[in-house]
Protein backbone atom coordinates (compact mmCIF):
# COMPACT_ATOMS: atom_id res chain seq x y z
CA UNK A 1 0.00 0.00 0.00
CA UNK A 2 1.33 3.40 -1.01
CA UNK A 3 1.63 5.85 1.88
CA UNK A 4 1.68 8.80 1.96
CA UNK A 5 -0.02 9.50 -1.35
CA UNK A 6 -1.08 13.09 -0.68
CA UNK A 7 0.03 16.27 1.07
CA UNK A 8 -1.16 16.74 4.66
CA UNK A 9 -2.23 20.13 5.97
CA UNK A 10 -1.97 19.20 9.66
CA UNK A 11 -0.10 16.80 11.94
CA UNK A 12 -3.23 15.17 13.34
CA UNK A 13 -4.34 13.80 9.96
CA UNK A 14 -0.88 12.49 9.11
CA UNK A 15 -0.50 10.98 12.59
CA UNK A 16 -3.83 9.13 12.34
CA UNK A 17 -3.16 7.85 8.82
CA UNK A 18 0.38 6.80 9.72
CA UNK A 19 -0.78 4.58 12.56
CA UNK A 20 -3.68 3.28 10.51
CA UNK A 21 -1.22 2.14 7.84
CA UNK A 22 1.20 0.83 10.46
CA UNK A 23 -1.47 -1.41 11.97
CA UNK A 24 -2.82 -2.52 8.60
CA UNK A 25 0.60 -3.59 7.41
CA UNK A 26 1.34 -5.52 10.61
CA UNK A 27 -1.95 -7.38 10.25
CA UNK A 28 -0.76 -8.65 6.86
CA UNK A 29 1.94 -10.83 8.47
CA UNK A 30 1.81 -14.55 7.71
CA UNK A 31 1.26 -15.96 11.22
CA UNK A 32 1.97 -19.50 10.06
CA UNK A 33 5.46 -18.44 9.00
CA UNK A 34 5.93 -16.50 12.24
CA UNK A 35 5.12 -19.68 14.19
CA UNK A 36 7.67 -21.60 12.11
CA UNK A 37 10.36 -19.03 12.90
CA UNK A 38 9.59 -19.10 16.62
CA UNK A 39 9.82 -22.90 16.59
CA UNK A 40 13.18 -22.81 14.79
CA UNK A 41 14.66 -20.21 17.12
CA UNK A 42 13.38 -22.04 20.18
CA UNK A 43 15.22 -25.14 18.96
CA UNK A 44 18.55 -23.46 18.25
CA UNK A 45 18.41 -21.39 21.43
CA UNK A 46 18.14 -24.57 23.48
CA UNK A 47 20.26 -27.12 21.57
CA UNK A 48 23.70 -25.59 22.26
CA UNK A 49 24.72 -26.55 18.72
CA UNK A 50 23.58 -23.89 16.29
CA UNK A 51 23.52 -20.14 16.02
CA UNK A 52 21.40 -17.39 14.53
CA UNK A 53 23.19 -15.02 12.16
CA UNK A 54 21.49 -11.72 11.31
CA UNK A 55 22.31 -9.01 8.76
CA UNK A 56 20.92 -5.96 7.00
CA UNK A 57 21.88 -2.62 5.45
CA UNK A 58 21.23 0.91 6.71
CA UNK A 59 18.30 1.01 9.12
CA UNK A 60 18.05 -2.75 8.77
CA UNK A 61 21.66 -3.02 9.96
CA UNK A 62 20.61 -1.25 13.16
CA UNK A 63 17.73 -3.72 13.48
CA UNK A 64 20.21 -6.56 13.00
CA UNK A 65 22.25 -5.34 15.97
CA UNK A 66 19.09 -4.79 18.01
CA UNK A 67 17.95 -8.33 17.22
CA UNK A 68 21.24 -9.80 18.48
CA UNK A 69 21.26 -7.61 21.61
CA UNK A 70 17.68 -8.30 22.67
CA UNK A 71 17.64 -12.00 21.96
CA UNK A 72 20.94 -12.70 23.68
CA UNK A 73 20.21 -10.61 26.78
CA UNK A 74 16.47 -10.98 27.28
CA UNK A 75 16.26 -14.70 26.61
CA UNK A 76 19.44 -15.68 28.44
CA UNK A 77 18.07 -14.00 31.59
CA UNK A 78 15.38 -16.69 31.82
CA UNK A 79 18.09 -19.37 32.33
CA UNK A 80 16.08 -21.51 29.90
CA UNK A 81 17.87 -20.40 26.74
CA UNK A 82 21.46 -20.09 25.60
CA UNK A 83 20.99 -17.97 22.49
CA UNK A 84 24.03 -17.63 20.25
CA UNK A 85 23.20 -14.69 17.98
CA UNK A 86 25.66 -12.94 15.69
CA UNK A 87 25.02 -9.68 13.84
CA UNK A 88 27.25 -9.49 10.76
CA UNK A 89 27.20 -5.69 10.87
CA UNK A 90 28.65 -5.39 14.39
CA UNK A 91 32.32 -5.65 13.41
CA UNK A 92 32.79 -2.39 11.52
CA UNK A 93 36.50 -2.98 10.95
CA UNK A 94 35.90 -6.38 9.38
CA UNK A 95 33.09 -5.02 7.25
CA UNK A 96 35.26 -2.26 5.81
CA UNK A 97 38.13 -4.69 5.24
CA UNK A 98 35.94 -7.02 3.19
CA UNK A 99 34.39 -4.09 1.32
CA UNK A 100 37.82 -2.68 0.49
CA UNK A 101 39.69 -5.90 -0.30
CA UNK A 102 36.92 -7.97 -1.88
CA UNK A 103 33.72 -5.98 -2.55
CA UNK A 104 30.64 -4.75 -0.72
CA UNK A 105 28.49 -7.35 -2.48
CA UNK A 106 30.35 -10.01 -0.50
CA UNK A 107 30.41 -8.32 2.92
CA UNK A 108 28.04 -10.88 4.46
CA UNK A 109 28.94 -13.92 2.37
CA UNK A 110 32.62 -13.73 3.31
CA UNK A 111 31.70 -13.71 6.99
CA UNK A 112 29.30 -16.63 6.57
CA UNK A 113 32.11 -18.67 5.04
CA UNK A 114 34.12 -18.20 8.22
CA UNK A 115 31.59 -18.64 11.01
CA UNK A 116 28.58 -20.64 9.79
CA UNK A 117 27.88 -24.36 9.68
CA UNK A 118 25.08 -26.66 8.54
CA UNK A 119 21.71 -25.97 10.18
CA UNK A 120 22.73 -22.56 11.47
CA UNK A 121 20.05 -19.96 10.74
CA UNK A 122 20.57 -16.89 8.55
CA UNK A 123 17.97 -14.16 9.06
CA UNK A 124 18.19 -11.20 6.69
CA UNK A 125 16.34 -7.93 7.18
CA UNK A 126 15.78 -5.97 3.97
CA UNK A 127 12.97 -3.57 3.11
CA UNK A 128 13.47 -3.96 -0.65
CA UNK A 129 14.67 -7.55 -0.59
CA UNK A 130 16.97 -6.76 -3.50
CA UNK A 131 20.23 -5.60 -1.89
CA UNK A 132 22.95 -7.56 -3.67
CA UNK A 133 24.87 -8.43 -0.51
CA UNK A 134 21.67 -9.75 1.08
CA UNK A 135 20.73 -11.82 -1.96
CA UNK A 136 24.26 -13.23 -2.22
CA UNK A 137 24.21 -14.19 1.47
CA UNK A 138 20.88 -16.01 1.06
CA UNK A 139 22.08 -17.89 -2.02
CA UNK A 140 25.27 -18.97 -0.27
CA UNK A 141 23.39 -20.00 2.86
CA UNK A 142 20.85 -22.05 0.90
CA UNK A 143 23.64 -23.78 -1.00
CA UNK A 144 25.42 -24.60 2.26
CA UNK A 145 22.41 -26.11 4.04
CA UNK A 146 21.61 -23.25 6.38
CA UNK A 147 18.04 -22.37 7.34
CA UNK A 148 17.20 -19.04 5.69
CA UNK A 149 14.66 -16.46 6.83
CA UNK A 150 13.89 -13.04 5.37
CA UNK A 151 12.03 -10.00 6.71
CA UNK A 152 10.94 -7.87 3.74
CA UNK A 153 8.72 -5.00 2.59
CA UNK A 154 7.65 -3.31 -0.67
CA UNK A 155 7.20 -6.21 -3.16
CA UNK A 156 9.61 -8.44 -1.23
CA UNK A 157 12.18 -8.60 -4.00
CA UNK A 158 14.45 -11.59 -4.47
CA UNK A 159 14.89 -12.17 -0.72
CA UNK A 160 11.19 -12.96 -0.36
CA UNK A 161 11.40 -15.56 -3.11
CA UNK A 162 14.59 -17.40 -2.17
CA UNK A 163 14.50 -17.46 1.65
CA UNK A 164 13.02 -20.69 2.97
CA UNK A 165 10.72 -18.70 5.28
CA UNK A 166 9.60 -15.12 4.74
CA UNK A 167 7.83 -12.52 6.86
CA UNK A 168 6.56 -9.78 4.56
CA UNK A 169 5.26 -6.33 5.46
CA UNK A 170 2.66 -5.11 2.96
CA UNK A 171 3.80 -1.51 2.73
CA UNK A 172 5.70 0.87 0.47
CA UNK A 173 6.91 3.13 3.28
CA UNK A 174 10.38 2.55 4.74
CA UNK A 175 9.43 3.87 8.17
CA UNK A 176 6.40 1.60 8.46
CA UNK A 177 8.31 -1.44 7.19
CA UNK A 178 11.21 -0.91 9.60
CA UNK A 179 8.88 -0.22 12.55
CA UNK A 180 7.08 -3.48 11.88
CA UNK A 181 10.33 -5.39 11.50
CA UNK A 182 11.28 -4.06 14.95
CA UNK A 183 7.90 -5.19 16.28
CA UNK A 184 8.53 -8.69 14.93
CA UNK A 185 11.88 -8.81 16.72
CA UNK A 186 10.12 -7.88 19.98
CA UNK A 187 7.21 -10.26 19.43
CA UNK A 188 9.54 -13.22 18.85
CA UNK A 189 11.75 -12.56 21.88
CA UNK A 190 8.90 -11.74 24.25
CA UNK A 191 6.77 -14.69 23.18
CA UNK A 192 9.68 -17.10 23.62
CA UNK A 193 10.27 -15.61 27.05
CA UNK A 194 6.60 -15.87 28.03
CA UNK A 195 6.53 -19.56 27.18
CA UNK A 196 9.09 -20.47 29.84
CA UNK A 197 7.89 -18.21 32.66
CA UNK A 198 5.17 -18.83 35.22
CA UNK A 199 2.31 -16.36 35.65
CA UNK A 200 3.89 -15.32 38.95
CA UNK A 201 7.20 -14.56 37.23
CA UNK A 202 5.49 -12.70 34.39
CA UNK A 203 3.80 -10.34 36.85
CA UNK A 204 7.11 -9.49 38.53
CA UNK A 205 9.29 -8.60 35.56
CA UNK A 206 9.32 -5.85 32.98
CA UNK A 207 8.99 -6.65 29.31
Enumerate the language-model features and the residues they cover.
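Glycine-centered short loops/turns at secondary-structure junctions
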Residues: 48-49, 119, 145
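Generic N-terminal amphipathic, Lys/Arg-enriched alpha-helix
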Residues: 1-29
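A short, well-structured juxtamembrane/interface segment
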Residues: 29-46
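Short, well-ordered beta-strand core segments
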Residues: 122, 148, 166-168
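Short glycine/serine/threonine-rich phosphate/pyrophosphate-binding segments
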Residues: 60-65, 130-137, 159
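Short, glycine/polar-rich helix-capping loops at beta-to-alpha or helix-loop-helix junctions
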Residues: 150-163
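A charged, well-structured terminal subsegment
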Residues: 114-115, 122, 175-207
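Glycine-rich, small/polar surface segments that engage phosphate groups of diverse ligands
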Residues: 43-115
